[in-house]
A protein has these predicted regions:
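Charge-patterned, long linear interaction tracts outside catalytic cores
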Residues: 187-188, 194-201, 207-220
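Membrane-embedded beta-strand positions of outer-membrane beta-barrel proteins
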Residues: 18-22, 88-90, 124-126, 195, ...
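Residues on the lipid-exposed face of transmembrane beta-strands in outer-membrane beta-barrel proteins
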Residues: 7, 20, 37, 69, ...
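N-terminal, post-signal-peptide soluble/periplasmic segments
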Residues: 1-58, 116-147
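Short loop/turn motifs that connect adjacent beta-strands in outer-membrane beta-barrel proteins
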Residues: 10-16, 80-83, 118-124, 202-214, ...
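Short Gly/Pro-enriched turn/cap motifs at secondary-structure boundaries
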Residues: 64-68
Length: 238
């Protein structure tokens, strides 16, 4: 099958039109995890294992979350006349997630141009949409929040990178250190374009009715995706 997408086109009044829009949104986690705080953990665990009390009082949920802020900006230029018109839109979006790792930066553009010859016989059109997406995430944030001992501290001024080093061999980790020190992201580059050449033959055979259309067209298009995944752990971590 064939899918036809109608894109916004430029104006035909001979003027250049410019529009700009911006928006800011905020996101905050609603704390719904019913887990032990440090005092409850001490009352439950130290009865059978006094060594499990590491002396701190850490709210791991608060330690890994933040206020998420998203900025969005869009700028558009359009113009043209009865035979040629164009429209160019550029946008930028930066989203900071509610955990320390998650974020997304995205920017791109969409350009369209079309031209019809004076006799209305030929029409040429082209569209191009490039886009770049950078994103970071961690799949283990809230699992660590649930498992971590709330008497474990986050920071240790004596360690090489300033974070408390969890005992090896356990199933918990300093998730704050992991989110801040590790790099685990994806970069995606997208490019979509198409060009169309069309001919309307009917006016040649029936010049008395130029509004009638018998169109034949050829379209060439391409969709390209480049994806890069990167992961880095510094030597001071772990």
């Amino acid at each position: 099958g064939v899918i036809l997408v109608n894109l916004k086109k430029g104006t035909r009044d001979g003027e250049v039109h410019t529009t700009y829009s911006a928006a800011v949104t905020f996101n905050k986690a609603k704390k719904e995890l019913d887990i032990m705080n440090a005092e409850e953990y001490r009352a439950y665990r130290t009865v059978s294992n006094p060594l499990s009390d590491m002396g701190a009082s850490t709210d791991w949920f608060d330690a890994v979350t933040r206020l998420g802020v998203t900025h969005m900006h869009t700028l558009t230029f359009s113009g043209g006349n009865a035979r040629t018109n164009y429209r160019v839109t550029a946008d930028y979006r930066k989203a900071q997630g509610i955990d320390l790792r998650s974020d997304r930066r995205e920017y791109g553009a969409r350009a369209t141009i079309s031209h019809t010859t004076k006799d209305g016989l030929f029409t040429f059109a082209a569209n191009m949409t490039p886009r770049v997406i950078d994103r970071n995430k961690s799949a283990s944030v809230y699992g660590s929040v649930i498992k971590n001992n709330p008497t474990m501290p986050v920071y240790d001024p004596e360690s090489a990178n300033g974070y408390y080093r969890f005992p090896s061999g356990g199933d918990s980790s300093n998730i704050v250190e992991q989110l801040n020190e590790e790099e685990n992201g994806t970069e995606i580059k997208l490019l979509e374009w198409n060009a169309t050449a069309a001919v309307n033959l009917l006016p040649l055979f029936n010049p008395n009715n130029p509004n009638m259309v018998l169109k034949s067209q050829v379209t060439v298009s391409q969709y390209q995706v480049d994806k890069f995944n990167g992961w880095f752990i510094p030597s001071t971590y772990g």
